[in-house]
Amino acid sequence: MFAYAFTFLVALAVTFVLTPVVKNFAIRIGAVDKPDARKVHHGLIPRLGGLAIYAGFMVSVIATIGFTYEMVGIMVGATFLIAVGIADDVYSLPPKVKLLGQIIAAAIPVVIFNINIEWIDVPRLGIIYLPEIISLPLTIFWIIGFVNTVNLIDGLDGLAAGIATIASIAIALLAFQMGQWVAAAAMVAMTGAGLAFLQYNFNPAKIFMGDTGSMFLGYIISAVSVMGSMKTVATAVLIVPLLALTVPITDTLLAIVRRKSSGVPIFSPDKNHLPHRLLAKGLNQKQVVLVMYALTAFFSCTALIVIHLSLWIGIAIVAIALVLFVLWARKLGVMQEIVPSPYQMEQKKKKDSD
């Protein structure tokens, strides 16, 4: 336990000390966040806070885990993604360029270091081994999916950092139960870095993590879970991060359905996501974020419980929880374009001018 405590404290201390340094650096180079159609803050706030999270995580991992083959692959890929994030936070990269960077970052541990979903344990069917033609693209898609899921929820002070930290705790607990020291320590390091950053990022935020941080958080969570799936029951290791991030994943899927049905481009930002609908109901930022934390903690605990239950009982519990969550989200209006997106307003302007 001392090793885990040391891992946590190193990440916590390094991130806490470096965040103000990164904040001043971001201001000096003009890397500041401006309000847009998805965000609710006012004024310019420095970003690049993800650099401090990255530094805290890396120093902690190197000091405690060392350079294991799998972690080197993840760290190299994460470093490349950090470079992409910095470029995006400073210069606002085109979406296609950013996606290409994400694909390359995901491919580094998967293709070069052979960290991929090689097999899954399916109840009644047993272990199913996946050929490379399926395993490689599936793992890359898995990592990119998590990267963008965390990136998309980074719209309120402390939201992405808190949700990712809770998910990291859940994965750390699972890895600890399964005797996976490296995966558990990596997630403990992420927990320490996330908690330290929240001291500056919780409402009212003094600094944002930017794409540098949100993409990094999603990357580490997904890549470490894949690393864990190579050494134990793959199904359990992959289910926990999926359920832990149920809230942002479901919110993203509902947003895609909403935009498709309204004829709005999928990547067009708006204020119809779950956090925005909660704000519209009269909750303040802190209250909304705490509600999202509570939901994430609930689904994380559910994940840690159902993996120990029989198949059909586990499926029933998860299905009921998901249905209730989706019905609640629909009632709040996340399936409707209640607040017109910039795309819709632009289309209306064109129509009125014709």
For the regions a protein language model found, what residue spans apply to each?
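Membrane-interfacial loop-to-helix junctions in multi-pass transporters
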Residues: Y129-T139, A184
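Membrane interface segments of multi-pass transport proteins and intramembrane proteases
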Residues: A26, G30-A31, D89-Y91, I120-L130, ...
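Alpha-helical transmembrane segments
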Residues: M1-F25, I29-G30, F57-A83, A160-D354
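Transmembrane alpha-helix boundary signature
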Residues: V59-Y69, A87-L93, V111-L125
